[in-house]
Amino acid sequence: GNYYEHNVIPKNGIKTARMLGHITYLSEEHMDSRFGRKFQDEGSKVEESVSFEVENYLQYKGEQFSELFDANSYILMTKVMDSYDAGKDKPLVEALKEVKAEFLIVGFYSDWLYPPERGKEIQIAAMNNNIRSSFVVLQGDHGHDSFLFSSKTYSNLITNFIES
């Protein structure tokens, strides 16, 4: 809504959206190894109703995000990301017909948002257009965020691709 006019920020909504989103960015393995079923230390609770460490972490991340990010920007960005489809009006292979670039497609086994199968679809469409492409799937414990964490293999892939 138009919260600017009323000077009321929809903090709970953006906080909840970030908490839900954050779960999909991380892998199940990472969440389990970091939090498991650990109960939250009473002295470091963000909210009184929080029982588990993972709840506290997500509450903290949501609170932090709600202070830094505008709710309308988040809504717009989410809609754009959700609705983008390179093959929306035609098959992906046709959408890539005019591409002159080479492709390096990197996926992570733990990524729930863009699983490796999506990368494979892009590579097949590229190959059907005689586009030089490489497709690699890496291990990463951080789900969709795996590319953000330092990885010598990931860095070497990108460096070799750019330099070749």
What are these model-predicted stretches?
Residues L20-T24, Y74-M81:
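Short alpha-helical scaffolding segments that buttress acidic/His motifs in well-ordered protein cores
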Residues V99, I105-G107:
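Short beta-strand/loop motif that positions the catalytic acidic residue
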Residues K120-S164:
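Catalytic active-site module of serine/aspartate enzymes centered on a nucleophile-bearing elbow/loop
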Residues Y60-K61, L76-A95:
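Active-site nucleophile elbow and catalytic-triad environment of alpha/beta-hydrolase enzymes
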Residues L96-K100, M127-N129:
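Short, conserved loop/helix-junction motifs that constitute active-site signature segments
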Residues G1-Q64:
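Alpha/beta-hydrolase-fold enzymes
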Residues W112-E121:
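Conserved alpha/beta-hydrolase "acid-adjacent" motif
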Residues E63-N72:
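Helix-enriched interaction subdomains in cytosolic or periplasmic regions
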